[in-house]
């Protein structure tokens, strides 16, 4: 199991300057961005940076070369984690056309599953909800909305009698600039606590919105587990509470397929972040089925997120 691995990669902006490396006795730069690739164990706890290059997009050719080199030294690549900003990679592999895996070039019997980064997707859910608003089905042809004003209303109502969401503040909905890069504020907004607060303060008037927030929360917990066992089924490793975890993924799939944007309700075509969520759900189920054949019983899904930026700090 130690050789079962996932590739994650990220293209990061850097200060455009010229630097002299004293140890290598060479000059680097100027460069606007750096491409970093990391391999990490999916079952065993290890990770290693294997590629760094400047002004380099992740392409299909480069990715397959990296996979082949890993496989040659005995590392089995089962998945690839990335954010939705890798346009060249996404386009060349036709990921937005519902392609969620490719045959492994070293062993066509195994697949490499694509995983758009769950924290990045959560931030995009938050951004679109606050900026455009979501329109959600409420049965019998009716709809309800969920957007900035609804969260603002909750924040102002919470605390008048009892404060259910102590972490939720105006900063969570007035996010601009670099603040939008923080995953924790998006997680607070779409948390189980927020879901319960909507129900407590507004009763059945916000029943649909409360359920949607909880659906997002369960999906993110399922895609971000870091311990084998947890009091919350969705926070346990994937496979430990398989029935409830699979149900959480399919609930999110249904929610994403049915949601519309309040500024353009008639538009039914999915945009990039919605497709990314649907791809990640299909990949999680497919990857787990593949790993089961090798005797793997559970997966810590946090190892399927993009983690390269942490290595650069």
Regions found by a protein language model. Give the residues of each.
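Structured nucleic-acid-interacting core domains from mobile-element enzymes and related host factors
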Residues: 1-44
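Non-catalytic regulatory appendages
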Residues: 34, 47-313
